[in-house]
Each structure stands twice: as C-alpha cells, then as structure tokens.
Amino acid sequence: MTVFSALLLAGVLSALALAVGGAVGMRLTSRVVEQRQRVATEWSGITVSQMLQCIVTLMPLGAAVVDTHRDVVYLNERAKELGLVRDRQLDDQAWRAARQALGGEDVEFDLSPRKRSATGRSGLSVHGHARLLSEEDRRFAVVFVHDQSDYARMEAARRDFVANVSHELKTPVGAMALLAEALLASADDSETVRRFAEKVLIEANRLGDMVAELIELSRLQGAERLPNMTDVDVDTIVSEAISRHKVAADNADIEVRTDAPSNLRVLGDQTLLVTALANLVSNAIAYSPRGSLVSISRRRRGANIEIAVTDRGIGIAPEDQERVFERFFRGDKARSRATGGSGLGLAIVKHVAANHDGTIRVWSKPGTGSTFTLALPALIEAYHDDERPEQAREPELRSNRSQREEELSR
C-alpha cells in the first residue's frame, strides 16, 4: 500500500468516525433535550416555592417567624392550633425564647398553660424550640412547637403505674416482714408458728398472683399478635372458668348457675379467654353476699358471642363504672382490700377483649348487682340459610328482652 493510499484510508476512517460520533452525539443531545422538556412539563404545575409552602402548611409542627418588635410575619395553621400564636400575638413563653434566639441562642421552652387552655384544647403538652432564622439577617427568629401530649400522658401513666405497683406490693411485703418477725419471736411455740406460717403463705400467694397478673397485663398491652388463635368452644371456656373458683364459691355458699350448653364458638386464645372469664367470675363471687347467686349466660347477638356474668352484690356507683377497668382502680377500697384482689383483674379482661377485637361492658345498680358482658366476634362458618344450626338462628328467634333483665330475674 502506497503512502497516498494509506493516507486516503486514514482519512476515510476518520470521516466515518466523525460521522458516527456526530450521529451518536446528536441522538444523545436530543435525548437530553427531551428529558429536560419532560421534567419542565412535570414541574410546570407547582413551583419550588409553592411546594415548600405546602410542606410548611401540612407539617405537624407549628411554625412562626417573629421580628424584633414581636410582630408575627409568618405562621402556619398548626401554630394557631397548638396555641403558639393567637390573634397574631406570640405566646409569652415563646416570645421570651424568641428574644434569646434573636441574640444568637438556641432555646427550648414549654408553652404557657394559659395560652393552651385559651385554644379550647385542654390537656395539651406543647414543647417548642426557637432559633435565629438567618445569620445574615438577625431581625427574625423562627419558633417551632410540637404536641407532646401523648408522650406526657404516657409518662404520667408510667409514674402512676409505678406508684400504684409500689403501693400494692408494699402491703403484702410489709405483712410478710411482720409475720416473719413474729415467727422468730415465737420459735418455741409450734401452734403460733403454724398460724403465722399460714398467714405468710397467704401473703406470699397474693404477692405471686399480683406479679403474675402484672406480667400478663404487660404482655397483653404489647403490640404482638396473639400466637395461639384457635377455634374455641365457648362452653369449655365457661366450664373452666367456673371450675377455677368452685372452692371459693362453695366457701361463700354462693351458687354459680349457668344456662344450657350453646355449642357457640369463637376464634381466640383459649387460655386468655378462660383467664378473662375467670376474673369476672372471681369478682362476682368476691362482691356478692353470702348465700347469693351468680349466673353465667351465653348467646349469639348479631356477629358477636356474648358471655354475661351477673351477681346480686353491692353494685358499682355510677361515677365508678367507667373506671372499673383501670389498673388498680377500686371503688370501695376497704371492701376491695378485704377480698384480697390486686386491682388488675378487670384491666386484664379489658385487654383480652381488645386483643380479640371484642369488648367488655358493665351494667350495675348499687344495692342490686352488676352484669359484666364479654362480647367476642363469632367464628365465621359457611352455612346455607336453611342449614344453619339452631344456635346460629338464635337472634332471629329470641325475644327482645334484655339479657341483663333475664339474669337478674332468676
């Protein structure tokens, strides 16, 4: 190949390379242009400024910008809801924090209680933070506030719980300490030792029951799903709950009466359901006069199975009926302590019901008695209308007479 031919070939190859490169470059350039046009089209509906405005408006924090004269130059709706700004006036505590922020400090504060109540939302716990808006322009401070009410309520509940547990544990522990001292002082008297030892055992059992109930309540209040959900026979639940307290009923000469077997079924944790119903039976026995009747009934009502426990006891005052399911709540404290209960039984019932997507409700009249009704979703079974068992048709055949009246009339 001559030098001329070689140069000619090199020139052709170079030309081809340039042509291909140009084509590719044009294609890439057109793609970039198309992409930019598409992005521009997508953003044409909202500007960055509008987007930021939407974010500030919708965020759960209250925000306000204030100048050195206490004039509020910007705020979002949440700032008014939380009491940071009212009638364009910054909260007193917030303004004190803002003045420090204008001096270059970052300040945390709590809103004034007076301002929070003025918003009509009592019980709010609002925490705030103030800082300089910009180092370049020191005329403005920005103040943020957020609602800490849930956290404050949780902390209050935790403190109450610790205080209640400490108080409840102090009684059996103190009793056991005194009994132990008495035992040491009576070591030579076998009869006295035996009597005090029996009392120590009673207090130890009470303490053990309380700890077990605390553990159970803690587990029920957790977020985990119940692990042992099975097809549960309601009649079995009733029988086991009664058997747990047969001795206590016999000792108090109380008859525990039930209606006929129902063949009703629910989906649930059998152990927890028995525990819940047993707690209701235990309460009914404990608060009933000697020689009275405690009755248990079960029925299907719509999509639910209802198990009702009725006593003819002292009843519950109307002002206490909403609180009986709280931990450690006792209406008649003297009577409650005499029964030896921990004050946790009904709280456990409430959480067992909630974990089964059910409910627990109470009807009571002082001097007449009480009915606690545990309602649980019925087990769904595929029956044709003409093949449903008698129990499934019960709501259609049963009279409208209330279950409570039926139980109390027995």
Swiss-Prot record:
Modified residues (Phosphohistidine): 167
Enzyme Commission numbers on file: 2.7.13.3
Residue segments, region Disordered: 385-410
Cross-referenced PROSITE patterns: HIS_KIN (PS50109)
Catalysed reactions, semicolon-separated: ATP + protein L-histidine = ADP + protein N-phospho-L-histidine
Pfam families xrefs: HATPase_c (PF02518), HisKA (PF00512)
UniProt entry tagged with the keyword Kinase: yes
Activity modulation: Binds heme and acts as a three-way sensor with three levels of activity. The oxidation of the heme by oxygen leads to the activation of the autokinase activity, whereas the deoxy-ferrous state confers a moderate kinase activity. Kinase activity is strongly inhibited by binding of NO and CO, which lock SenX3 in an inactive state. Activation of the SenX3-RegX3 two-component system is inhibited by PhoY1 and PhoY2 when phosphate is readily available.
Modification note: Autophosphorylated.
CDD domains per the UniProt record, alphabetical: HisKA
GO biological process: cellular detoxification; phosphorelay signal transduction system
Membrane-traversing stretches: 6-26, 46-66
Disrupted-gene phenotype: The senX3-regX3 deletion mutant shows a growth defect after infection of macrophages and is attenuated in both immunodeficient and immunocompetent mice.
GO cellular component: extracellular region; plasma membrane
Keyword field: ATP-binding, Cell membrane, Kinase, Membrane, Nucleotide-binding, Phosphoprotein, Stress response, Transferase, Transmembrane, Transmembrane helix, Two-component regulatory system, Virulence
Any GO MF annotation of the entry: phosphorelay sensor kinase activity
Location of this chain's protein in the cell: Cell membrane
Residues in Histidine kinase domain copies: 164-380
Induction: Part of the senX3-regX3 operon. The two genes are separated by a rather long intercistronic region composed of a class of duplicated sequences named mycobacterial interspersed repetitive units (MIRUs). Significantly up-regulated after 28 days of hypoxia.
Topology of the protein relative to the lipid bilayer: Multi-pass membrane protein
UniProt-recorded name of the protein: Sensor-like histidine kinase SenX3
Organism in which the protein naturally occurs: Mycobacterium tuberculosis (strain ATCC 25618 / H37Rv)
Name of the gene this protein is made from: senX3
